[in-house]
């Protein structure tokens, strides 16, 4: 065919001729035809956006970080995409999820203290415009599957009222993987109530007892993918229950890890493997149904691993609930055929609050309807390797911090500042806070458990404590050179300390009051048998 076409071309210049009647309209019609699914992916329509959020996955809980827990699907995706090696989340569930969906620091939403507990009349402020709302405005179909944990005391707080077309999952922070029940103490009633926490849309879903949640969520996610028309932009937020406690997993996932003698770590490893398999099933569905070539796939944890429940962040210091690197250094990567660079490790500073402006820009939407954002559009940083627009990161300021899982022998009370150094006048260093600027990080107050936790083994299952005195309230580190936070540089760089304290004071001055209301006994699910809105 090609040769015959070439032979038919005129050998010399031919005179210009007017287009034959009807040819011009035909060309116009051809130009206006919609492109075939998969053709010119990304050039003519916004990409599909799939965000998978793991729960309590630690730095040392994936094999691409050297763990003996096998994560082949995550490894393959990270190796073929962009591994985020200087990526941060918050140290707890609600704060990370709120910053993901608002693009704003906790100090600007009132959620800077702990999490939203089952009976608290609280949720992400209703005047905040969330990521799914912005994507809907940009023409996306929006689905959420899994853990919400952003408040549910009134119906206006529910996912389906905050921008998601569909929702399937649970509203609180944790529950049984099989019964899907959550037990919680209602203080004012002096009773512990156990009730179902599972929803399909806004309706209680009762037909899933004895079904493992990760499998159910994966099935729903893949069903949404397979029924989705490729020409319509999709946003799928899959917030897995894995690998948050309780430590539960089908028996067959335990057998490959019989060599792990620590019981918590043994179960946890099986849970990670099942989660890895789930991610593989989701990406397989995207590929088999023609969506992958125009998909940006993001994987992230919500905080560091909880060493009390099998997680591990070695060699990083600390764990979930803490502002040490082990509590906030995120496991994350981006995989997509649309990336301009692939198979690279990105060392630029990126935070979970950056996803909102990044994804809205990719969606060709607008953030004009939001309150002032703390996040940055980092797509060029990820896709092309450009310098990150983020130079500074406020990890948090919590004036009411109490560590509910302190190191052995540590006090629950925050540390008291015993220093008279003039630079300390810039900020009250007894406050639980941390900030990052460039390669510098400063922690103040009591940051949470500051031990190092080696992976459990037959020879070593104990934490390595720090030698810091209990009155210490200030720690500056060069994180690029010292990611394990072992070398306090306060004596060597007092001017850096002073500058970072001034920045903390700036943020503290511009923060809103902490919103952490007392329990409301009307939350009691005794009458309905299910947790849900009560106002």
Curated annotation (Swiss-Prot):
Post-translational modification note: The conversion to 3-oxoalanine (also known as C-formylglycine, FGly), of a serine or cysteine residue in prokaryotes and of a cysteine residue in eukaryotes, is critical for catalytic activity.
Catalytic machinery residues: 93 (nucleophile), 149
Gene Ontology molecular function terms on file: metal ion binding; N-acetylgalactosamine-4-sulfatase activity
Cofactor, how bound (note): Binds 1 Ca(2+) ion per subunit.
Residues spanning the signal sequence: 1-41
Catalytic activity from the UniProt record: Hydrolysis of the 4-sulfate groups of the N-acetyl-D-galactosamine 4-sulfate units of chondroitin sulfate and dermatan sulfate
Cofactors demanded by this protein: Ca(2+)
Binding site for substrate: 147, 244, 320
GO cellular component, one term: lysosome
Enzyme class of the recorded protein, top EC level: hydrolase
Principal location: other
Residues holding Ca(2+): 55-56, 93, 302-303
Glycosylation, residue list: 190, 281, 293, 428, 460
Calcium is among the record's keywords: yes
Cysteines engaged in disulfide bonds, as pairs: 119-523, 123-157, 183-194, 407-449
UniProt-annotated location(s): Lysosome; Cell surface
Similarity field: Belongs to the sulfatase family.
PANTHER family attached to this UniProt entry: ARYLSULFATASE (PTHR10342), ARYLSULFATASE B (PTHR10342:SF274)
Illness: Defects in ARSB are the cause of mucopolysaccharidosis type VI (MPS-VI). MPS-VI has been described in Siamese cats.
Name under which the protein is recorded: Arylsulfatase B
């Amino acid at each position: 065919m090609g040769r015959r076409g070439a032979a038919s071309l005129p050998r010399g210049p031919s005179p210009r001729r007017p287009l034959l009647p009807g040819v011009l309209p035909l060309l116009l019609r051809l130009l206006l035809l919609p492109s075939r699914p998969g053709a010119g992916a990304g050039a003519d329509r916004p990409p599909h956006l799939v965000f998978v959020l793991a729960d309590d996955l630690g730095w040392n809980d994936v094999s691409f970080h050297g763990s003996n827990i096998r994560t082949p699907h995550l490894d393959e995706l990270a190796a073929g995409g962009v591994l985020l090696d200087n990526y941060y989340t918050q140290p707890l569930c609600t704060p990370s999820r709120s910053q993901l969906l608002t693009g704003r620091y906790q100090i600007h939403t009132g959620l800077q203290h702990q999490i939203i507990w089952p009976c608290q009349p609280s949720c992400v402020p209703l005047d905040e415009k969330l990521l799914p709302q912005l994507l809907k405005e940009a023409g996306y179909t929006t689905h959420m599957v899994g853990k919400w944990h952003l408040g549910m005391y009134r119906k206006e707080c529910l996912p389906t009222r905050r921008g998601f077309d569909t929702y399937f999952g649970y509203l609180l922070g944790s529950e049984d993987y099989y019964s899907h029940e959550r037990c919680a103490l209602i203080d004012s009633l002096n009773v512990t109530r156990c009730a179902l926490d599972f929803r399909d849309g806004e309706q209680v879903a009762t037909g899933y007892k004895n079904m493992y949640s990760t499998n159910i969520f994966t099935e729903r996610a893949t069903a949404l993918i397979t029924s989705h028309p490729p020409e319509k932009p999709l946003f799928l937020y899959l917030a897995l229950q894995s690998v948050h406690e309780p430590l539960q997993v089908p028996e067959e996932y335990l057998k490959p890890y019989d060599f792990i003698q620590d019981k918590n770590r043994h179960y946890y490893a099986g849970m990670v493997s099942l989660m890895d398999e789930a991610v593989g099933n989701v990406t397989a569905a995207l590929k088999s149904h023609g969506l992958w070539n125009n998909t940006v796939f993001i994987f992230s944890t919500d905080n560091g691993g909880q060493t009390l429940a099998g997680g591990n962040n070695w060699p990083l210091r600390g764990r979930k609930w803490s502002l040490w690197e082990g509590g906030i250094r995120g496991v994350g990567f981006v995989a997509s055929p649309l990336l301009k660079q692939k198979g690279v490790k990105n060392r630029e500073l990126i935070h979970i609050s950056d996803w909102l402006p990044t994804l809205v820009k990719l969606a060709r939407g607008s953030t004009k309807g939001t309150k002032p954002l703390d996040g940055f559009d980092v797509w060029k940083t990820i896709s092309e390797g450009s310098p990150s627009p983020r130079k500074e990161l406020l990890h948090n300021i919590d004036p009411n911090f109490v560590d509910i899982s302190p190191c052995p022998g540590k006090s629950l009370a925050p540390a008291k500042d015993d220093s008279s150094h003039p630079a300390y006048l810039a900020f009250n260093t007894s406050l639980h806070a941390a900030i990052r600027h460039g390669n510098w990080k400063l922690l103040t107050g009591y940051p949470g458990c500051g031990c190092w936790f080696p992976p459990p083994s037959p020879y070593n299952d104990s934490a390595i404590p720090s030698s810091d005195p209990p009155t210490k309230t200030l720690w500056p580190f060069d994180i690029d050179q010292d990611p394990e936070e072992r070398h306090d540089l306060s004596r060597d760089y007092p001017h850096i300390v002073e500058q970072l304290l001034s920045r903390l004071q700036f943020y503290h001055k511009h923060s809103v009051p902490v919103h952490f209301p007392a329990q409301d006994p009307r939350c009691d699910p005794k009458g309905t048998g299910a947790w849900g809105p009560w106002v």
